[in-house]
Amino acid sequence: MTRLDDTNWKDFIRSTSSLKKQLSERQPLGSVLSKTSAIMADYSRPSDDELESIGDSYRLMSEYMLRGFQDNSRADLYGKLVQRLYRKLTDVELQVRKQFDPFVRTLVPRDATRLDVDSLRNGLELFVSDLAMLTLEPEQKVAEKRKMLYERRHNIMSNAFNQILCSGQWSNEHANDIANLILSPIIETTDALSLSAAVMMSSLLSPDPVKVLLLLRIYKEATDEKLKQRALIGWVFALDNGDFNLFPNIRESLKPLMADKGFRDELVELQMQVVFCMSAEQDTETIERDVMPNIIKNQNLEV
C-alpha cells in the first residue's frame, strides 16, 4: 500500500479519471467497483459510506437478478448506481486536489463547511433592508453606516463565493435552494451575478451535473439580462468541462432550448465571442509587430 502524498497524487487522479472513462464507455459496473476498491486500498484511502452503499446496492441487485426475480426498475437502478459512482469518484478527485494540488489548495476557504443557504439569504436580504433604512438616518452618519454595511456584505459574499467554489457534488435540494436565492428579487443583482459566477467556476474546477442544471434553470427563469447571460456562459463552459453522457436529464433539459432558433443563434454568437477572445492576444501581437511599424514609418500615408 502507498500513502497519498505530493509525489503520487497525480497518479491517483489519473487512475480515478480512467475509472470514470470506463463508466462513460458503459463498461460493467461490477468491474469498475472492484477496481475502485483496489485503488482506494492501494493508496490507503479511508473507507467511504457512499462507496460502500453503492457496492451493497449493486450486490443486492445482482443477487436478485441471479435468483430470477423480475424487476422492471432494474435498468433505472443500475443507471443511478453508475451515476452515483461517477459523482463519488469526481468528489474524491476534488478532495485529493484540495489536499495536494498547490493551485487548488490556495482556493480552499478556512471555513470548509457546506454553505448555509438560509443564513446567506438572511444576510443578503438584511443588507438590502438596512441600506433602504439609511434614508432615515442623520446625514452625518449615512456615509459611515453605508461603509459598514458594504463591508459586512463583502465579507458575506466573499465567504459564500469561496465555499461554493471549492464545494463538491451537490444534492438537488441544495442546488434548488441556491437557485431560488439567485433568482430572488429581494437580493441585489450584483450578488446574484457573483453567486452564479461562483457556481460556474466550481463546475469548471470539478464537473457536477447538478450545477449545470442549476445554471440552466437560472438561464431559463432569470428576468435580468445580465444574470441570464452570466448563466448562459456558465452552463456552456461547465457542460464542455465534463463528460455528462451518463446524465440524460441534462440532454432532456437542453432539447426544448435547442429547438428554438433564437437560442441557437445566441449560442453561435457566444461561440464567436469566445473565438474572438482566444485570438485577441495573437491579433494584438500581429498589429504591434507588423502593422504599427509600417504606419509609423509611412509618414505620407493617405487616409
Segment roles from a protein language model:
Residues 28-32, 228, 247:
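Solenoid-repeat scaffolds in large eukaryotic assemblies
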Residues 2-139, 151-155:
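Extended, helix-rich scaffolding/adaptor regions
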Residues 119-222, 234, 238-246, 279:
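Alpha-helical solenoid scaffolds in large eukaryotic transport, assembly, and signaling factors
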Residues 226-227, 303:
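Cullin-RING E3 adaptor/co-adaptor recruitment helices
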